[in-house]
Structures are given as structure tokens and as C-alpha cells.
Regions:
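Short, acidic/small-residue loops that bind anionic groups at enzyme active sites
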Residues: 40, 125-153
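Gly-rich Lys/Arg/Thr-decorated short loops/hinges at beta-loop-alpha junctions or inter-strand turns
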Residues: 4-6, 67-80, 141-151
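N-terminal phosphate-binding or glycine-rich loops at protein starts, especially the Walker A/P-loop
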Residues: 1-51
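Short glycine-rich or small-residue beta-strand-to-loop segments that form or flank ligand, phosphate
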Residues: 3-13, 73-79, 105-111
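Conserved small/polar residues in nucleotide/adenosyl-binding loops
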Residues: 157-159
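Short, ordered loop/turn segments at secondary-structure junctions
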Residues: 9-11, 39-45, 79-80, 112-113, ...
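Short Gly/Thr/Asp-enriched flexible loops that form oxyanion-binding sites at enzyme active sites
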Residues: 19-23, 113-131
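Glycine-rich nucleotide/cofactor/substrate-binding loop typically near the N-terminus or early
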Residues: 33-102
Length: 159
């Protein structure tokens, strides 16, 4: 079974931790995920291979319920933007190498505009390089009501 890695970036909010909790629950309950890891401090945590085993740290429903209602960003955050993969392929190659080294087949990144840009660039890189053993997904959230082109967004209700 492949492992799942979740990371968060951008502004902290209570909804961002609730998302992490949902990812942990879904990973555990799916029966298709080996371990659920969290990258500390966003994509920088991925690049630095700074992971925590979330299904061990949050091994009870009570711990996950507390995380879900805890404000801030439990995994930490960053404001790092990935460059253009055509100009800086090394950064993308390193991310793929690290994900494969840790047997990660699912990467979920939650955050705002820059985070979704990271998801987009990494997804396109995987597609263009026929990387089909890693699925990259975004969980959009905003505290600024500035995230367009999505019908669902964490942290803020769009009216």
C-alpha cells in the first residue's frame, strides 16, 4: 500500500486543521493507505523531508477531534513558491525522488492561491513526465476570500 502525505501552507485557520483531520480519517478508513504523513512547514517540509507520522501522533478519535477544532496550522506553514518546472526541473525532480523514497503515492496540499499553484505545477510536471505512481491533489482554502475558480473552499463561505 502506498502512503499519503499531507501538507498545509498559507494563512492559518481552524478549517485547515479540520482538513488535516479529514485527511487522516479518510486515509485510515480507506484501507488503501499504508501511513498518513504530514510535512512540517508546507512544501519546504517536503523538500527537507521533514515528516511526522500522523496516524501515530493522532492515533485516537479523541486526538483527531481535538485537532479538528484547534485554531492555527498544526503542521506549520510556508510561503515558498515552486518555480517554473521548465526552468527549475531539479526542484520537481527532488520532490518526486523524496515522495518515491518514502513510498508516497498520494500528496494532498491545502492552502490558498500559491498552494494551489504548487499543486497545479506539480500535477502538470507529473503528467508531462508520465509519473502515474503519485497522485497530487489540492484542498483549497482561503482566509481572504480571494481564491477563485472553485465551487467549494475551506475557511470562508462564498455567497
Amino acid at each position: 500500500m502506498k502512503n499519503l502525505l499531507v501538507a498545509q501552507s498559507g494563512g492559518p485557520s481552524a478549517a485547515i486543521n479540520a482538513t488535516i483531520t479529514g485527511v487522516i480519517d479518510a486515509g485510515i478508513e480507506s484501507g488503501r493507505v499504508g501511513h498518513v504523513y504530514g510535512a512540517l512547514n508546507g512544501i519546504k517540509g517536503v523538500l527537507n523531508e521533514n515528516f511526522v507520522n500522523l496516524d501515530e501522533v493522532c492515533d485516537t478519535k479523541e486526538k483527531r477531534d481535538l485537532l479538528a477544532i484547534t485554531p492555527a496550522a498544526a503542521l506549520g506553514s510556508c510561503r515558498w513558491k515552486l518555480g517554473d518546472p521548465k526552468e527549475n526541473a531539479e526542484e520537481f525532480e527532488e520532490i518526486i525522488r523524496i515522495l518515491r523514497k518514502n513510498d508516497i503515492g498520494y500528496f494532498i496540499y491545502t492552502g490558498g492561491n500559491d498552494s494551489m499553484d504548487t499543486v497545479y505545477k506539480l500535477s502538470v510536471y507529473c503528467e508531462e513526465h508520465n509519473i502515474d505512481d503519485i497522485k497530487v491533489m489540492g484542498a483549497p482554502k482561503t482566509i481572504d476570500n480571494d481564491l477563485g475558480e472553485t465551487d467549494h473552499c475551506l475557511s470562508l463561505i462564498h455567497i
